[in-house]
């Protein structure tokens, strides 16, 4: 994770608070922006909002009910296509592509039934450490610690005031910056040590929330679902040397193809902002044999060419009915 991702989260929080204050006008404004033109949508989870948890994580959810309502509304003006259909020349009618990042269980349990009901194609970009259950989903563990305590103490002696919802969010964001600096090669030990006063099991959180390999295969068997890749460890590729970055990209493709028995042609850059994705990363994705690659910023799709197919912009779909 990176400063760019942090800025994205702050931006999401700001937008979410604006939604609360101004509903319904902002609701329609937000959807109007998404529905204006052709675009690829970025989602992460399809699950009900948990009011006991924190906004930086909950903002990444859309409820099954909202997803269904959004599809109903978008179907009046847009054609739903898969990434495999995304090629020049562009369709005359505005189109929309649904994509999910990381690989959460609710993509199968909650999102798939909605897409099946309306016959809408979608893509799930799987980070292979998720179904391997080696992913350190620390942001959810941190949320659990902060949400369930009014005060927390870290091993450096700092006492953090978590008495209000806003303070909990502020503490989450502050601790997030500290955690992002933990060494990758000893992350689990460092995280556990830093929160030594609390019961922590990072791998259990992965088993709770991440797709298993059997579940990835179930998704891959759906004619509506395309499985894409998102590296093996959800790392910031821009911080890696050429060979290491290339192996992160290539090995995720190879592992997913081996597990699903299907060709994996589409890639999502982890974090995906301009801070983590440069021209080198675009070239590496193309070199690995992908047909497309998406980023986490941008707007409408107005042009498709060999070059732009590896920097496809996305819009983040936010559930405007969440009670923030």
What are these regions (language model features)?
Residues 98-99, 227:
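Residue-level marker for buried hydrophobic side chains located in beta-strands
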Residues 113, 217, 282-283:
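Alpha-helical segments flanking ligand/cofactor-binding loops in enzyme cores
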Residues 2-98, 106, 137, 221-222, ...:
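C-terminal active-site subregion of NodB/CE4 polysaccharide deacetylases
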Residues 102-109, 114:
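Short acidic, Gly/Ser-rich segments with clustered Asp/Glu that frequently serve as metal-coordination loops
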Residues 41, 47, 116-275, 312:
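Metal-dependent polysaccharide deacetylase catalytic core of the NodB/CE4 family, i.e.
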Residues 86, 101-103, 127-129:
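Beta-hairpin (beta-strand-turn-beta-strand) motif
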């Amino acid at each position: 994770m990176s400063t760019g991702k942090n800025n994205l989260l702050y931006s999401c929080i700001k937008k979410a608070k604006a939604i609360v204050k101004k509903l319904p006008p902002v609701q329609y404004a937000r959807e109007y922006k998404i529905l204006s033109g052709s675009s690829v949508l970025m989602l992460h989870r399809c699950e009900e909002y948990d009011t006991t948890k924190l906004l930086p994580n909950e903002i990444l959810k859309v409820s099954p009910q909202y997803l269904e309502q959004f599809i109903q509304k978008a179907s009046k003006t847009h054609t739903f296509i898969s990434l495999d259909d995304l090629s020049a020349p562009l369709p005359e009618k505005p189109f929309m592509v649904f994509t999910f990042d990381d690989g959460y269980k609710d993509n199968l349990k909650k999102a798939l039934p909605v897409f099946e009901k309306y016959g809408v194609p979608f893509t799930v970009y799987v980070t292979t450490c998720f179904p391997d259950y080696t992913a350190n989903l620390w942001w959810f563990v941190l949320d659990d610690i902060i949400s369930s305590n009014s005060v927390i103490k870290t091993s450096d002696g700092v006492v953090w005031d978590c008495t209000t919802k806003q303070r909990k969010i502020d503490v989450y964001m502050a601790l997030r910056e500290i955690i992002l600096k933990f060494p990758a090669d000893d992350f689990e030990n460092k995280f556990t040590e830093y929160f030594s006063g609390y019961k922590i099991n990072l791998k259990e959180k992965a088993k709770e929330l991440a797709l298993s390999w059997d579940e990835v295969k179930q998704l891959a068997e759906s004619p509506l679902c395309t499985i894409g890749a998102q590296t093996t460890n959800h790392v910031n590729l821009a911080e890696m040397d050429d060979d290491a970055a290339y192996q992160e990209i290539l090995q995720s493709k190879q592992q997913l193809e081996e597990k699903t028995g299907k060709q994996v042609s589409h890639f999502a850059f982890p974090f995906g902002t301009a801070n983590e994705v440069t021209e080198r990363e675009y070239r590496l994705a193309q070199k690995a044999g992908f047909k497309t690659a998406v980023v986490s910023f941008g707007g409408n799709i107005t042009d498709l060419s060999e070059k732009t197919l590896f920097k496809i912009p996305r819009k983040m779909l936010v559930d405007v009915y969440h009670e923030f």
